[in-house]
Design a protein with these regions (language model features):
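Short linear motifs at protein or domain termini
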Residues: 1-97, 138, 211-214
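Non-membrane alpha-helical structural segments and their capping/turn regions in soluble enzymes
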Residues: 9, 78, 85, 123-126, ...
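Juxtamembrane/interface motifs at transmembrane-helix termini
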Residues: 47-48, 98-101, 125-128, 166-170, ...
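Conserved amphipathic alpha-helical segments that form helical-bundle/coiled-coil interaction surfaces
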Residues: 98-162, 175-181, 185-188, 193-204
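Short arginine-rich
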Residues: 203-213
Length: 214
C-alpha cells in the first residue's frame, strides 16, 4: 500500500509540475496508456493520480478520449487573487502583536532567497514565493487559514503556468520590492503599511498579466 501511494504521488506531482512549466498546453489531452508507458508503472497508480488531478480541477475526464488539461480563465485568476487579498490581509491584521524578532529574521531570509533567484523557470521561483506567503500567513497561528491559503496558492500555480512568462520580468521586480517593504514594515511594527504592501504585491501579478494581454 505504501508503494502504491508513493507512485500515485509521484505521477501526480510530475504531471502537475510539467503543466506549471508549460510542457503541457491548455486543452491538451493526456492518456492513461501514455503515462503508464512514461512512468513504467501499472495502471492503478496512474489512474488514481489522474482521478486526483480531476478532483483538483486540473484535468477533466473525457470518456474514450483521455484527460484534458483544464485552461484557467482570466476571470478565475482575478477571483483567486482577490480572494487571496481578503484572506492574507485579514490574517496579517490578526498576527499583529504576535510577531517576534525571530519571525522577522525568517521572513528576511526568505525574501533574500527570492531576490537572488534569477531563474525564469516557473517552479523554483513560485516555490520561493509560496514559502514567503505561507510564512507570513503562519504568523497568526491559525492552522486552518494556513491550510486554505496553501490550497489557494496551489491553485494559483495553474494560472502562473499560463501567464507567468509574459509578465515575468516586471512582476518579479515588483514582487521583490514589495516583499522587502512588507518585512521592513513588520520589523517597524507598522502593520498598516505591511498590509498596503501585501495588497500591492498580490495584485501586481494581476496588473502585469492584464497589461501583457492588451
Amino acid at each position: 500500500m505504501e508503494s502504491k501511494i508513493t507512485l500515485k504521488t509521484t505521477v501526480y506531482n510530475t504531471v502537475f509540475e510539467d503543466l506549471i512549466e508549460g510542457r503541457y498546453k491548455p486543452n491538451e489531452i493526456l492518456t492513461e496508456g501514455a503515462l503508464v508507458e512514461r512512468f513504467g508503472v501499472s495502471k492503478a497508480p496512474v489512474r488514481e493520480a489522474l482521478i486526483e488531478l480531476c478532483k483538483d480541477g486540473i484535468l477533466r475526464s473525457l470518456p474514450r478520449l483521455g484527460y484534458q488539461i483544464v485552461p484557467v480563465t482570466l476571470q478565475e485568476m482575478i477571483d483567486l487573487l482577490d480572494f487571496r487579498v481578503d484572506l492574507e490581509l485579514s490574517n496579517l491584521r490578526r498576527a499583529a502583536g504576535r510577531i517576534t524578532e525571530s519571525d522577522i529574521r525568517c521572513l528576511r531570509e526568505l525574501q533574500l532567497n527570492l531576490g537572488h533567484d534569477y531563474s525564469e523557470e516557473v517552479i523554483p521561483h513560485w516555490s520561493l514565493n509560496m514559502q514567503f506567503h505561507m510564512a507570513l500567513c503562519q504568523l497568526s497561528g491559525n492552522a486552518y487559514t494556513s491550510k486554505v491559503l496553501y490550497a489557494a496558492l496551489h491553485q494559483s500555480s495553474r494560472f502562473v503556468s499560463q501567464y507567468f512568462k509574459a509578465a515575468w520580468s516586471k512582476a518579479r521586480e515588483s514582487e521583490g520590492r514589495y516583499h522587502m517593504a512588507i518585512v521592513d514594515a513588520l520589523a517597524a511594527g507598522d502593520i498598516a503599511t505591511a498590509e498596503q504592501m501585501l495588497r500591492k504585491d498580490i495584485l501586481a501579478v494581476k496588473e502585469e498579466i492584464q497589461l501583457s494581454l492588451k
